[in-house]
């Protein structure tokens, strides 16, 4: 899901690695506009708008973080979708400040989770994991800390969806050793 002022690296790096793994990946705008401006002022063209997208067979809902994470609260459809995904045990991923959305929705209760330093207290009900860990998966939810861990998050999602072997191949081919 793309919101205004989400950090550019999170969405681009995670989407890039998922697409390299041939995982169908759609960037969905929650702003009502197909063109979404990142926190760094980069315009990203979404694939579709949330109110037009049909969620059928999607394996993952990913929330990039950054200063725009608060705008997720303004999108009631997204919040309901997150609750529905969690109820069905569908995979949800979030990075930086975005895991706080999951915490505030009660989706992290009893689960290990992490967020950008300073946002841990908003991971309501979570077992908070900190450095040196870079990404943590507990059940259907995967969280990560920030820009420097976005490739780790992408590779973890590839591992979960397509397996360890492909994740390692991508790690090597991207020189992330």
Regions found by a protein language model. Name each.
Residues 7, 17-30, 47-177:
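Active-site-adjacent pocket-lining segments in enzyme domains
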